[in-house]
């Protein structure tokens, strides 16, 4: 079975069997995807995280299918109907739909029309009709008129019911209809009569019809949502006449009275059994594909958001802006600890701008603030303008930060534990400030689904979505690495090999024993075994550690290699890291071993070049157009600066500084053809856009980037 799996995975994924075998072996030993991708390149042949995850997903699917096979085999054996030929077919089948087709005739059924007919003794009549030789079947049917069968027509109808079930359970028939659905199924949606007003948001789908194979994931999910809400009536299917003709060619072999009865049974089988069954199958299959696409888009957006550029360890003022209730202001030190909070009222109805600025200036000086983070919600533009109208005594950078999900964090258990003595407004402002300092460290505290970068996220498979988003967060956290002495429990939880319990144990150990001075000290943490240490150590950094390698992505298992490099050059590790000239003299091929290849050595040399480098780029200041505050200020043809706020498979949404985001359709993103928005844009990217159309009634803005960002 194992070799079969390896062969099938290789064919499906285009990865050599040996690499799949070794990757699965590492996964079965408890190695994580980030660890395997980073530190076991020689073993896997350099597979990346996406490939390793694909191996795991497909392997799990095959295992599920194998379990289903066992259940089916057991069920057929219990009925005493297993044959050598049937067993061989089951053994050779690795397609879910085919497997279920094989099992269908043996599957326990509720009391079907065919079953009732069999109980009435009509199966021999059905067999007679299927042979299609009898010139006068009605005459032969008279023998079956007894008991619950009242007349010849009832006998014929019962026989047709048995034939219809046989047609439905016939593999060739099912594949015939399945192929028709695959090639030509049309998805049709219509508004439910009398619900036009209630269904206004689904106006685009009030009377739409398109081939299923060309229906994009976002359209399909929107249509299915409308159906779930009882606002749209949805159907799916190929040409019925063509399908029944195909089935008749399979089963009707004579143009006599028996053949006519079989033709009737075939039409009934298609309409009552086959079509609904295959329609359900294709509805589920198309929904699964749409889910996978929506989840892929969400995960990619989340990755870009988590890997947004950090300001770094600077003293920051966070402002959660507002009108009536004022602006909540907090001051944080370079480690993100809360130093001070108060309210200011620069806007109506209170309108105390002079007093507000005086307070801001005093806080800037008292707490030596280096940057200001303003939430991008209500009163954001007004607060930014209020601050920029004044001249500060010191050089201060002002940033507008997304506050999506901040309110969810502020009311969460995590926030209450961090700030038990403060209300939600303070916690929200702190979150805004910390997002500027380190988006990744702050956003891991929030359920990814609350961050607002998904499409139809509530309509997709929730367990699959959670798994994908959790893996995305884990991937990002391990890509960046974390400071072992400052990372929160929530951040540490996502580190390879840790999880909630070990993460909490690390924080507890830190509180009791002070800062870690070396990675080896991790082995003193309760429940930290050698395997967990192996998995996590390379992703945890200790700035200013006695061993400088403890602040790099070099794994402790490779320290001896770096030490040997330094020894061969007549220096210590610190001198090797500090001297470009010394590093030029390293000949990596000298350090090759049976287990350490060139990929690992190249990674080590990159780390020595830039120890503990952050893969996230430097942060940039951005300004919206000062003349645009609301949708009423917009004009067609206007060119504006914007920030990409969300990406879907049909385009990108851009924040242009007003309440409503504009949409740049896929066709308007570039001067060339692109199939994926991620080819040209990323979350939080600064872009220039031109307004194509404004729909004031529906609050929709169409934008273009063609010719704007060259």
Which sequence ranges carry the predicted segments?
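Long, highly charged, low-complexity intrinsically disordered interaction regions
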Residues: 2-5, 63-81, 91, 417-515, ...
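Generic start-of-chain signal for non-secretory N-termini
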Residues: 1-21, 28
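Duplex nucleic acid-engaging cores and interfaces of nucleic-acid transaction enzymes
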Residues: 51-54, 61, 65-75, 79-318, ...
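A glycine-rich phosphate-binding loop feature that marks nucleotide/adenosyl-phosphate handling sites
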Residues: 179-186, 319-323, 377-382, 401-408, ...
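Structured, non-catalytic alpha/beta "coupling" segments that mediate domain-domain communication
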Residues: 75, 89, 99-102, 226-239, ...
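Single-stranded RNA-binding regions, centering on S1/OB-family and related RNA-binding modules
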Residues: 542-710
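Short, ordered loop/turn segments at secondary-structure junctions
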Residues: 39-41, 130, 239, 321, ...
């Amino acid at each position: 079975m194992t070799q079969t799996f390896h062969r099938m995975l290789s064919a499906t994924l285009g990865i050599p069997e040996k690499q799949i075998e070794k990757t699965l072996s590492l996964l079965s030993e408890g190695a994580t995807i980030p660890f395997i991708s980073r530190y076991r390149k020689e073993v896997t042949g350099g597979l990346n995280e996406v490939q390793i995850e694909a191996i795991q997903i497909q392997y799990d699917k095959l295992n599920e299918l194998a379990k289903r096979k066992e259940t089916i085999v057991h069920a057929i054996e219990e009925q005493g109907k297993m044959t050598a030929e049937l067993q061989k077919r089951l053994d050779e089948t690795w397609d879910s739909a085919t497997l279920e087709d094989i099992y269908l005739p043996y599957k326990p059924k509720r009391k079907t029309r065919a079953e009732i007919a069999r109980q009435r003794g009509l199966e021999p009549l059905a067999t007679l009709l299927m042979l299609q030789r009898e010139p006068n079947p009605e005459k032969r049917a008279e023998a079956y008129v007894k008991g619950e069968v009242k007349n010849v027509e009832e006998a014929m109808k019962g026989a047709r019911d048995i034939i219809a079930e046989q047609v439905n359970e016939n593999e060739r028939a099912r594949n015939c209809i399945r192929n028709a659905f695959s090639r030509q199924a049309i998805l049709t949606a219509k508004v439910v009569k009398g619900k036009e007003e209630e269904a206004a948001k689904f106006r685009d789908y009030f009377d739409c019809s398109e081939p299923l194979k060309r229906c994009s994931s976002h359209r399909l999910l929107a249509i299915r949502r409308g159906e779930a809400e009882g606002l749209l009536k949805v159907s799916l299917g190929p040409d019925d006449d063509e399908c029944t003709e195909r089935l008749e060619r399979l089963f009707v072999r004579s143009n006599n009275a028996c053949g006519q009865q079989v033709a009737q049974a075939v039409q009934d089988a298609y309409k009552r059994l086959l079509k609904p069954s295959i329609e359900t199958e294709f509805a589920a299959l198309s929904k699964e594909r749409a889910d996978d696409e929506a989840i892929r888009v969400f995960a990619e957006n989340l990755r870009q958001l988590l890997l947004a550029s950090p300001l770094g360890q600077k003293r920051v003022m966070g402002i959660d802006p507002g009108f009536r209730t004022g602006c909540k202001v907090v001051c944080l030190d370079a480690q993100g600890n809360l130093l001070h909070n108060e309210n200011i009222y620069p806007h109506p109805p209170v309108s105390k701008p002079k007093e507000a600025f005086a307070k801001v200036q005093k806080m800037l000086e008292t707490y030596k603030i280096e940057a200001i983070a303003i939430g991008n919600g209500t009163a954001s533009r007004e607060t930014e303008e209020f601050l920029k109208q004044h001249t500060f005594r010191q050089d201060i950078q002002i940033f507008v930060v997304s506050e999506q999900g901040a309110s969810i964090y502020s009311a969460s258990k995590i926030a209450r534990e961090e700030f038990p003595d403060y209300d939600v407004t303070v916690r929200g402002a702190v979150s805004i400030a910390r997002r500027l300092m380190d988006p990744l460290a702050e956003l891991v505290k929030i359920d990814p689904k609350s961050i607002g970068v998904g499409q139809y996220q509530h309509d997709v498979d929730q367990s699959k979505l959670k798994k994908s988003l959790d893996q995305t967060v884990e991937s990002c956290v391990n890509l960046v690495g974390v400071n072992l002495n400052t990372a929160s429990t929530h951040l540490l939880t996502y580190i390879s090999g840790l999880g909630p319990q070990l993460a909490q144990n690390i924080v507890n150990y830190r509180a009791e024993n002070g800062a870690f001075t070396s990675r080896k000290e991790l082995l003193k943490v309760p429940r930290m075994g050698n395997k967990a240490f192996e998995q996590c150590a390379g992703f945890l950094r200790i700035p200013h550690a006695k061993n400088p390698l403890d602040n790099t992505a070099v794994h402790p298992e490779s320290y001896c290699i770096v030490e040997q490099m330094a020894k061969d050059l007549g220096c210590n590790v610190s001198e090797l890291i500090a001297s470009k000239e010394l590093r030029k003299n390293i000949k990596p091929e000298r350090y090759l071993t049976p287990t350490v290849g060139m990929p690992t050595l190249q990674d080590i040399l990159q780390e020595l070049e830039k120890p503990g480098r952050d893969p996230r780029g430097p942060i940039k200041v951005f300004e919206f157009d000062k003349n645009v505050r609301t949708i009423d200020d917009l004009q067609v043809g206007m060119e504006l600066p914007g920030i990409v706020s969300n990406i879907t498979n049909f385009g990108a949404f851009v924040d242009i500084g007003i309440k409503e985001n504009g949409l740049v359709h896929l066709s308007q993103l570039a001067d060339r053809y692109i199939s994926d928005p991620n080819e040209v844009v990323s979350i939080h990217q600064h872009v220039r856009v031109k307004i194509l159309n404004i729909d004031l009634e529906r609050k929709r803005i169409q934008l273009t980037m063609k010719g704007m960002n060259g």
